[in-house]
A protein has these predicted regions:
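Active-site loop architecture of trypsin-fold serine endopeptidases
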Residues: 268
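Beta-lactam-recognizing serine transpeptidase/beta-lactamase-like catalytic domain environment
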Residues: 1-33, 38-265, 277, 281, ...
Length: 338
């Protein structure tokens, strides 16, 4: 866990307040499309959505004075894996509404995303959640706007998505530490089958989607980009971004989750002026994994191993393969009015 800029712990009084601020557990941020991991898992685990289902993303969704649109519009029906791979806000919002507001609240509560974490750090912050959770809140929260959490909230929740479906309260104490005397909360949040599907989706983003720059040769990285405009003086500022990439590896049997979040990054010549998660945060994750995996003694994984491919390839039960048949329209009619 790191928060930059940092300071000399032997001389804290000399450090500016900004340097003493622990962004990993004290800062709360709208973490954008990283939340699509939770929405996809929630929809799949509910039984109301399958990997084969499709959603109409042809037009933006208008709710009152709000318009939900896509950064890279495909303007067609998308399957669930395509919604995730193309990071469609429209498709994700419709998946959330298929489950409903009450279902979303319960799901995020179970992941610890709506309350302060019990981690052993006194500065750990409370998330910011809507006072009134309306349908428009359900839709925007589905893609990580309208809710602000700490980076530790996000990493602990993503761990549950990829580890087989069990949420474990985060701790900074080693399991065998004499100081670790209390039993940490732990409970199942999704099925093992849904967790396996989430691993497929996250690997898909790195292989074919917006997260290609996060890959690290031999370590089967999977993940999700997240780019959110910051709220400044009560309005979202288009040029002030929180850019993130959250990853797990190796995706055939995840051992670690890594999150990199940059506060107001600037585009460069190398990023063609872009400052989004896929351009600025994903390469950080790639470098961290490439350097830490050998230190941790993790063996490299052969991505072409048939067993690995069977675990991570998306077929029909899931799409995104060229020349496959069109996805089945999402069951139910409630979404048509949004």
């Amino acid at each position: 866990m790191a928060s930059l800029p940092d300071y000399d712990p032997m001389r804290p009084a000399e450090a500016p307040a900004d340097h003493r601020f622990n962004r990993a557990v004290q800062g709360v941020y709208e973490l954008g499309s990283t939340f699509k991991i939770f929405t996809s898992a929630m929809a799949l685990d509910s039984g109301r959505v399958t990997m084969r289902d499709g959603v109409d993303t042809t037009d933006p969704i208008r709710v009152g004075r709000f318009t939900i649109s896509d950064f890279h519009p495909q303007s067609r029906w998308l399957s669930v894996p395509e919604i995730f791979m193309y990071s469609s806000n429209i498709g994700t919002a419709r998946l959330a509404m298929a489950v409903g507001t009450e279902g979303q609240q319960k799901f995020l509560n179970n992941l610890g995303l709506t309350q302060r974490l019990s981690v052993e750090l006194p500065e750990a912050a409370n998330p910011i959640v809507p006072k009134t959770w309306r349908d428009v809140s359900t839709m925007t929260i589905s893609y990580g706007h309208g809710i602000a959490v700490t980076p530790m909230h996000l990493t602990s929740a993503v761990s549950a998505m990829v580890n087989g479906g069990v949420w474990n309260a985060p701790t900074i104490l080693a399991a065998n530490s004499p100081d670790n005397t209390h039993k940490l909360p732990s409970h199942r949040v999704i099925s093992e089958q849904t967790s396996a599907q989430v691993r497929q989706l996250m690997r898909l983003v790195v292989e074919h989607g917006t997260g290609g720059r996060a890959d690290a040769d031999g370590y089967l990285v999977g993940g999700k980009t997240g780019t959110a405009e910051k709220a400044v003086n009560g309005r979202y500022a288009e040029r002030s971004l929180i850019s993130s990439f959250v990853a797990a590896f190796p995706m055939n049997d995840p051992k670690y989750v890594v999150l990199a979040t940059l506060d107001e990054p600037k585009g460069t010549k190398d990023t063609y002026g872009y400052a989004t998660g896929g351009w600025v945060a994903a390469p950080v994750v790639s470098q961290v994994i490439a350097e830490m995996a050998p230190i941790l003694g993790l063996p490299r994984v052969n991505a072409d191993d048939p067993k690995v491919r069977r675990a991570l390839d998306i077929r029909f039960d899931g799409p995104v393969i060229e020349n496959e048949p069109e996805p089945t329209p999402l069951r139910g009619t409630r979404l048509a009015s949004y």
